[in-house]
């Protein structure tokens, strides 16, 4: 790196320094994301140990599904609309950014207060509407839990505003770290309180943890001082109007995206007890994998894409999307193959203890396998949607997102009777795949040269490498071993998983796949593939 700096001009040196900084951020953010998902998934371990796939586990997934729908509604509205506008306001004046933050924060607080009141006073009607298949006893527990979770909705919803603001200020680590601490607090709190309070312990720890996370993120935002001031800065008002203009087209699409998950739970509530939990455990595991890799990468890339689009550097914009696309494909294809091939050992090692029985493992692993088929789709969806957002185009992904939600619901209803919970999972994967095909085609038209013929040799190399991985995985899975948890971990999971990945890495090296070099750079030097993505440091 020192030799490279000597050989480059001052302008290139600055570029290298920016790339190195982004690389360190990606690595650190991925590390925190890993810890966050470990702590977050430890919550599922605790629930699995105490409740397995019983009625109480169904209540847990149904209740958190409703709560998180409200919280993520705020995030999905705020992140693509507030982030680029707040970033612009920082270059104007401190009063403009402060006024914008105040208006966004208080507006979200008003919405969340109404949502919390609805949970308190109309929860009974809500559960009858959203969970019609629940028995009276399950519905009563769900109602009580949702009412107790209303403060958590308010606090955690507001953290979506502070999280977005910190990302707009490029304080990625300060945005992510409090969330990791929150997840750890929830896990420790559940372990301590579940034996005493039962499932209602969830409301206590989420409420207290949400308040702590909000206060921590507010501390790192200089504009938090504006919350107690009445500032009539006209620029701040105009910026807030721009946020609302960007948010407007998102509202219907985001609501429909939340409806999709709620309808899945609605349909699953009419199936035999435990099948809603099968979907819940498996979907959360896929989400954890996505957040550790693709989402962490795209979170940083999105900020850079927004700046490139604002500066009208469309050639670099297209190049960054193209190279990120290739990297995501390279990461997700082998991981998807491993998840599909090792679905039962993964679920058994992670969950099968306490109240989580062998039957629970069998059902959850089947749902997990279906979701694993969609890992590539889910990874690319994050990139494509955020690419449109960086271009300040929220209408296109929202429009096709709505159409795909209708497709998801239609397929889920059609497949429910013949396939049960597997039909719900399959419908979700099919609809998401249709969405990324459409968005990819539109993005390719807007960004000339995005998916040109240069990608064909790469796809051929990747296909050949993947075939070798599948053959090696099949061979290693054929090794017989005694049926115990330790042997399952060693011979059914680690041996075939690591062995197949080593074969994949070796083939990538022999075929000189560039994305393999980027990953080696990440592991050896803690420099993520940013330099490789830009190719400016050569």
Segments and roles (model prediction):
Residues 2-538:
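Membrane-embedded alpha-helical bundles of multi-pass transporters/translocases
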């Amino acid at each position: 790196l020192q030799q490279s700096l000597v050989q480059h001009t001052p302008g290139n040196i600055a570029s290298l320094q920016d790339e190195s900084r982004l690389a360190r951020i990606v690595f650190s953010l991925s590390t925190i994301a890993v810890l966050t998902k470990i702590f977050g998934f430890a919550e599922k371990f605790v629930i699995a140990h105490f409740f397995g796939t019983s009625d109480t586990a169904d209540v847990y997934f149904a209740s958190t599904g409703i709560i998180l729908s409200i919280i993520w509604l705020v995030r999905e509205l705020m992140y693509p609309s507030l982030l680029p506008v707040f970033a612009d306001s920082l270059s104007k004046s401190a009063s403009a950014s402060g006024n914008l933050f105040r208006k966004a924060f208080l507006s979200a607080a008003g919405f969340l207060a109404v949502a919390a009141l609805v949970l308190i006073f109309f929860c009974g009607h809500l559960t009858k509407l959203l969970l019609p298949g629940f028995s009276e006893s399950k519905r009563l527990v769900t109602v009580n839990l949702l009412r107790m979770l209303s403060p958590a909705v308010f606090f955690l919803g507001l953290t979506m505003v502070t999280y977005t603001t910190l990302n707009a200020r490029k304080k990625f680590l300060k945005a992510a770290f409090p969330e990791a601490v929150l997840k750890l607090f929830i896990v420790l709190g559940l372990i301590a309180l579940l034996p005493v309070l039962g499932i209602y312990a969830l409301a206590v720890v989420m409420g207290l943890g949400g308040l702590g996370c909000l206060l921590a993120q507010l501390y790192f935002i200089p504009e938090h001082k504006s919350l107690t001031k009445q500032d009539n800065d006209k620029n701040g008002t105009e910026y807030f109007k721009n946020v609302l203009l960007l948010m407007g087209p998102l509202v219907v699409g985001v609501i429909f995206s939340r409806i999709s998950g709620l309808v899945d739970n609605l349909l699953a509530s009419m199936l035999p007890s435990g099948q809603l939990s099968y979907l819940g455990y498996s979907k959360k595991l896929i989400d954890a994998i996505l957040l550790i890799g693709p989402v962490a990468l795209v979170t940083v890339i999105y900020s850079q894409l927004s700046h490139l689009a604002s500066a009208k550097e469309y050639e670099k914009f297209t190049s960054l999307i193209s190279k990120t696309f290739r990297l995501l494909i390279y990461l997700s294809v082998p991981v998807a193959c491993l998840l599909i091939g090792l679905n039962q050992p993964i679920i058994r090692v992670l969950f099968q203890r306490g109240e989580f029985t062998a039957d629970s493992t069998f059902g959850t692993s089947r749902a997990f396998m279906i979701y694993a088929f969609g890992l590539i789709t889910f990874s690319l969806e994050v990139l494509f949607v955020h690419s449109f957002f960086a271009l300040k185009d929220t209408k296109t992904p929202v429009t096709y997102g709505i159409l795909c939600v209708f497709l998801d619901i239609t397929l889920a209803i059609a497949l429910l009777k013949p396939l049960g919970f597997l039909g719900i999972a399959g419908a979700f994967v099919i609809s998401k795949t249709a969405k990324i095909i459409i968005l990819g085609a539109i993005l390719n038209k807007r960004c000339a040269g995005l998916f040109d013929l240069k990608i064909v040799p790469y796809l051929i190399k990747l296909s050949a490498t993947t075939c070798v991985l599948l053959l090696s995985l099949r061979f290693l899975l054929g090794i017989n071993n005694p049926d115990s948890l330790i042997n399952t971990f060693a011979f059914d999971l680690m041996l075939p998983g690591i062995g197949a990945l080593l074969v994949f890495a070796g083939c990538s090296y022999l075929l000189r796949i560039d994305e393999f070099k980027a990953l080696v750079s990440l592991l050896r030097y803690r420099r993520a593939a940013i330099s490789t993505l830009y190719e400016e440091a050569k």
